[in-house]
Amino acid sequence: MAGEHIKVIYFDGRGRAESIRMTLVAAGVDYEDERISFQDWPKIKPTIPGGRLPAVKVTDDHGHVKWMLESLAIARYMAKKHHMMGETDEEYYSVEKLIGQAEDVEHEYHKTLMKPQEEKEKITKEILNGKVPVLLNMICESLKGSTGKLAVGDKVTLADLVLIAVIDHVTDLDKGFLTGKYPEIHKHRENLLASSPRLAKYLSNRPATPF
């Protein structure tokens, strides 16, 4: 997106914006990362089309503004623009399959959000002893089927980025949950960071946030 200014607007967290941020980082695209506090959100909300975050504001050289909404649609758009959705129809399917599997895990994680602590702990226990292990095993099987070291072949795709964003959310719920299990997921992250120094640097330097 040469000549364009890209602003990613979200709260001060990883959340639904992280796959967008990581896609831009992995593609080597500069962007402005605007993080909004919950206190400031009510006065900023009317300025965002649809009043929802994340949103991306793209301003061209002539000052024309384009708003982009819906987190995964934005991430897919950016990934496609920068050749990160697979090189063949088969790879595209594999990318989308892994995104779907990761989103199934994300759906479970979302059940814990905005809940009182006692209820959150109860839900966390239920999902980590229920659907999440099943879903993670499905992801491991998909990773085993890759023709390369990454999620789909040897080039970074959106599947890699959505996956590690979701795995970080699982770790947020229980820091030791993945320890000694799911070797394919651990190896995938190791291979991804080795394949993309830009992404490795971003992850090591990004601010610690609760979500």
Swiss-Prot record:
Q: In which tissues is it expressed?
A: In the adult, expressed in excretory epithelial cells but absent from the caecal epithelium and flame cells. Also expressed in the tegument and its extensions into the parenchyma. In the schistosomulum, expressed in the tegument and associated structures. Not expressed in digestive tract, reproductive organs or muscles (at protein level).
Q: Give all N-acetylalanine modified positions.
A: A2
One annotated GO molecular function: glutathione transferase activity
Q: Which PROSITE patterns match?
A: GST_CTER, GST_NTER
Which residues belong to any copy of the GST N-terminal domain?
Answer: 4-86
One of the protein's GO biological processes: glutathione metabolic process
Which residues are noted in the entry as glutathione-binding?
Answer: Y10, F11, R16, W41, P42, K43, I44, K45, L53, A55, V56, E70, S71
Which Cys residues form disulphide pairs?
A: none
Give the matching Gene3D superfamilies. 1.20.1050.10, Glutaredoxin
Per the record, what are the reactions this protein catalyses?
RX + glutathione = an S-substituted glutathione + a halide anion + H(+)
User: Which segments does the entry list as coiled coil?
Assistant: none
Is Hydrolase found in the keyword set? no
Name of a matching Pfam family? GST_N
Domain of life where this protein originates: Eukaryota
Q: What else is known?
A: There are at least three isoenzymes of GST in S.mansoni.
Job of this protein: Conjugation of reduced glutathione to a wide number of exogenous and endogenous hydrophobic electrophiles.
Assigned protein family: Belongs to the GST superfamily. Mu family.
Its quaternary structure? Homodimer.
Q: In its UniProt entry, what is this protein called?
A: Glutathione S-transferase class-mu 28 kDa isozyme
Its source organism is Schistosoma mansoni (Blood fluke)
Q: Which gene encodes it?
A: GST28
